[in-house]
């Protein structure tokens, strides 16, 4: 860097520090895919506020390009697997989720999924081992004296790094399978009577049989995660720290939990003072479209356009499925912008244009956009909420069915089954969302709720990270439930004591009554004899 530019950068940093009153050092343990998009947005805001950000990233990561983010420092951790192997694992999972598992019986697909996640856990353990047992790296991190560590607990290890460095940390996530991390590590209440378990596709208004399903899912996830995930990490963390401990004991030390959802998206539920809901922090006003794309959008006239994307992970569909979708799109008067990298469908209509990539947020914010066809990823749904665009959902896996179930319940979306839908089903869903004004009205209502917050989600998230840096933690927000055993948490010891007291009182009264009755009989017999 030239001396003049370096001096300007230093001056800018000093001005930022003077404005905020504090310049901190932030260490980051990220997750990939859409998780990184949200975290990156927060980190960019922290850099704007004058903080120094260092991201720990693996040499085989697919989504974090450490050569394209000059605002961050990167510590690249060498691991034995390369990017090709990581990409193969990801593609294998997508193939299973999109094309294989939907054709299997539930028990068979569940068993296959279990085997896959057991392997993933072992791979993550290897990555963590390459991090915390890398003595030169850990020494460098200790010497850097970081003020806070921001981690995504979906990928364990960040909290272990924080524990070994003696640094307070902040968790950032949307959900964990079965809410197990939030419930058992964060002590967040999640009554299954009205809080839907993630991956169940349920809403907060459940019938009796849906509550049965929710309870079964809750118990199954608790058992599965404890048996196949937490057990592994409990042993790993104990070995790394040289003392008996558990994943939840370490993860539960998080000062603040930043949850990537909000009440425009989430159903009402209990939460704790150290849980902050920051959903939609990545959303922003639309920017002008590229010239060619803008011309295509304007050519739609009063009919407007439909935006179609299945996210960054699903790049291709089977030829049959692609033709089915293209056939439905060809029958609507709107122009369609479809993000798709596969072979051009034979049934593609003249109103539909394929793109390798689209500026999704900018398109959703365009005044001519009438509907959004989505797989139900939370980032895309939040952009639709932000701009007030109704949706047609085609969920594939993970939390996508849950997200779309919520949007359906709020009247802002129609859902079609990706595996069983016909061209007529998709066409009918599109016509409903576009022609029925209630869907647009409900989407705009959610948009108004999202925008009507006293503090923007991004500012709120950045504030709490800075708060932890300023105060060396947030222990005053930590509930005492972390210090209780499971039987104390559920007051089983108190209930047992009270039952013992009641039983003792009943026994005492019974004994007194029997004693009195026996004395009364003896007195009666004595009187008769006299």
Swiss-Prot record:
| Membrane-crossing segments per the record | 495-515
Membrane topology, as annotated, equals: Single-pass type I membrane protein
Task: Drop me one GO molecular function for this one.
Answer: glucuronosyltransferase activity
**InterPro entries found in the cross-reference section:** UDP-glycosyltransferase (IPR050271), UDP_glucos_trans (IPR002213), UDP_glycos_trans_CS (IPR035595)
What CDD domains does this protein map onto? GT1_Gtf-like
Q: Does the keyword Membrane apply?
A: yes
The chain's Extracellular topological domains, given as residue ranges, are 24-494
Query: What tissues contain this protein?
Result: Specifically expressed in liver and small intestine.
> According to the record, what induces this protein's expression?
Up-regulated in kidney and liver following in utero morphine treatment.
Give start-end ranges for the coiled-coil region(s): none
Going by the UniProt record, its keywords in alphabetical order are: Glycoprotein, Glycosyltransferase, Membrane, Signal, Transferase, Transmembrane, Transmembrane helix
- Name the glycosylated positions: 316
Q: State the function annotated in the UniProt record.
A: UDP-glucuronosyltransferases catalyze phase II biotransformation reactions in which lipophilic substrates are conjugated with glucuronic acid to increase water solubility and enhance excretion. They are of major importance in the conjugation and subsequent elimination of potentially toxic xenobiotics and endogenous compounds.
- Which family would the database say this protein is a member of? Belongs to the UDP-glycosyltransferase family.
Q: What is this protein called?
A: UDP-glucuronosyltransferase 2A3
